[in-house]
């Protein structure tokens, strides 16, 4: 299973570790993914999603229904 957010499509980025002497080595910035259950009151059911912590903040701000609708329009969910 790839480490990708189900709703936003966020995935790992590539960057550099930079030492004090400015030596650079490649590294990967992973996404902070959390397996979380959300309640859909319209459908009266729970869904389990693997989402980034930043996406959970967005869901708390905008609501799960609005975020699901946006993810569907952007093609992240069917």
From Swiss-Prot:
One of its GO terms (molecular function) is structural constituent of ribosome. The keyword Zinc-finger does not apply. One of its GO terms (biological process) is translation. The lineage of its organism: Bacteria, Pseudomonadati, Bacteroidota, Flavobacteriia, Flavobacteriales. SUPFAM superfamilies: L28p-like (SSF143800). This is Large ribosomal subunit protein bL28. Belongs to the bacterial ribosomal protein bL28 family. InterPro entries: Ribosomal_bL28 (IPR026569), Ribosomal_bL28/bL31-like_sf (IPR034704), Ribosomal_bL28_bact-type (IPR001383), Ribosomal_bL28_sf (IPR037147). GO terms for cellular component: ribonucleoprotein complex; ribosome. Keywords: Ribonucleoprotein, Ribosomal protein.
């Amino acid at each position: 299973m790839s480490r990708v957010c189900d709703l936003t499509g966020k995935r790992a980025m590539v960057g550099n570790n930079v030492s004090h002497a400015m030596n650079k080595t490649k590294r990967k910035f992973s996404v902070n993914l959390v397996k979380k259950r959300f309640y859909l009151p319209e459908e009266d059911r729970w869904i389990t999603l693997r989402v980034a912590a930043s996406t959970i903040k967005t869901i708390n701000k905008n609501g799960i229904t609005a975020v699901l609708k946006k993810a569907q329009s952007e093609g992240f969910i069917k």
